[in-house]
């Protein structure tokens, strides 16, 4: 072990004496590059935050479009819009859970329109389910025909 220790200082001393200027120049460049990396990483972190904020999906635009289609002269507050958005998310989650359960009962890996239709009948009450099924059938027919 002693010879290894002797070899390392022997290698460093001649190298240090021969190129002290050459070592300083790259040493100065490396911290500059090192300083730029955290700034770039910080900028990338900001971009990630912006992307995360932009990826929040809501139904606010669609709620507003339907409202203006049904009642053009009526507005909606931001609090009411938030309530409607959470209501739609809740119904969507219930329908997805029920249709997944139905697909599992039938031992199918895929949720088809039949599972969705049955889930709508189970989750939504009475007349609302009938209207939802008819509108859904109409939308699927329009989609497949075009």
From Swiss-Prot:
Residues 1-16 have a biased composition (Basic and acidic residues). PROSITE patterns: HISTONE_H2B (PS00357). Keywords: Acetylation, Chromosome, DNA-binding, Isopeptide bond, Nucleosome core, Nucleus, Ubl conjugation. It is found in: Nucleus; Chromosome. The modification N6-acetyllysine is found at residues 7, 35-36. The keyword Ubl conjugation applies. Residues 1-52 are annotated as: Disordered. There is a cross-link at residue 142 (Glycyl lysine isopeptide (Lys-Gly) (interchain with G-Cter in ubiquitin)). It comes from the Eukaryota. Pfam families: Histone. Coiled coil: none annotated. One of its GO terms (cellular component) is nucleus. GO terms for molecular function: DNA binding; protein heterodimerization activity; structural constituent of chromatin. Its main location: nucleus. InterPro entries: Histone-fold (IPR009072), Histone_H2A/H2B/H3 (IPR007125), Histone_H2B (IPR000558), HISTONE_H2B_site (IPR055333). Can be acetylated to form H2BK6ac, H2BK33ac and H2BK34ac. Core component of nucleosome. Nucleosomes wrap and compact DNA into chromatin, limiting DNA accessibility to the cellular machineries which require DNA as a template. Histones thereby play a central role in transcription regulation, DNA repair, DNA replication and chromosomal stability. DNA accessibility is regulated via a complex set of post-translational modifications of histones, also called histone code, and nucleosome remodeling. The nucleosome is a histone octamer containing two molecules each of H2A, H2B, H3 and H4 assembled in one H3-H4 heterotetramer and two H2A-H2B heterodimers. The octamer wraps approximately 147 bp of DNA. Belongs to the histone H2B family. This is Histone H2B. It comes from Nicotiana tabacum. The lineage of its organism: Eukaryota, Viridiplantae, Streptophyta, Embryophyta, Tracheophyta.
């Amino acid at each position: 072990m002693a010879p290894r220790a002797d070899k390392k200082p022997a290698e460093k001393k001649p190298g240090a004496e021969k190129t002290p200027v050459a070592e300083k120049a790259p040493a100065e460049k490396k911290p500059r590059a090192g300083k730029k990396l955290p700034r770039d990483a910080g900028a990338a972190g900001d971009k990630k935050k912006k992307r995360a904020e932009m990826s929040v999906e809501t139904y606010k635009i669609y709620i507003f479009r339907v409202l203006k289609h049904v009642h053009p002269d009526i507005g909606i507050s931001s609090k009411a819009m938030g309530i409607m958005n959470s209501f739609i998310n809740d119904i969507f989650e219930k329908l997805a859970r029920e249709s997944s359960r139905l697909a599992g009962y039938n031992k199918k890996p895929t949720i088809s329109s039949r599972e969705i239709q049955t889930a709508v009948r189970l989750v939504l009450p009475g007349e609302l389910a009938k209207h939802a099924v008819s509108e859904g059938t109409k939308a699927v027919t329009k989609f497949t025909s075009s």
